[in-house]
Design a protein with these regions (language model features):
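Active-site beta3 strand of CheY-like receiver
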Residues: 46-52
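Acidic catalytic/metal-coordinating carboxylates
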Residues: 35-38, 61-64
Length: 143
């Protein structure tokens, strides 16, 4: 299986480095960004497999960044990783298009498992779409 490319958008540099180092030990490829504006730019430049984003950041928060991403990309899995734990924040995150929401503090093993689950789900969805497309093509060719 190919390595998973994660775009990590986190303004706390120490936490970002800990996450980066831990995920790289698990064979993930990590790109980091320190705020939502940089994250938005890197997302469209690099097309990561999954986006992990804090919510509270300078210049552009994670909610706004994901809202803008979802205008043109609805497929890339998004996991919010944030201290914003109020139910209205969680609901807002999912309404904006997040696939998962992990509250700080969190365990690294939980983050790893959630990322792998998101990628597995994305892979299965892509396979289903490809199979459906092939079936449509086969059906059209038979007519």
């Amino acid at each position: 299986m190919e390595k998973i490319h994660v775009l990590l958008v986190e303004d706390e540099q120490t936490l970002a480095m800990i996450i980066k180092d831990t995920l790289e030990e698990q064979d993930f490829i990590i790109t980091t960004a320190g705020d939502g504006e940089e994250g938005l730019r890197k997302f469209f430049e690099q097309k990561p497999d999954v986006l992990v984003a804090d919510v509270m950041m300078p210049r552009m928060d994670g909610f706004e960044m994901v809202r803008r991403i979802r205008q043109s990309d609805k497929a890339t899995p998004v996991l919010f990783l944030t201290a914003r734990s109020a139910i209205n924040d969680v609901v807002k995150g999912f309404e904006l298009g997040a696939n998962d929401y992990l509250k700080k503090p969190f365990g690294m093993q939980e983050l790893i498992v959630r990322l792998k689950a998101l990628m597995h789900k994305a892979f299965v969805e892509k396979e289903i779409t490809n199979t459906y497309t092939c079936l449509l093509y086969t059906s059209d060719a038979a007519d």
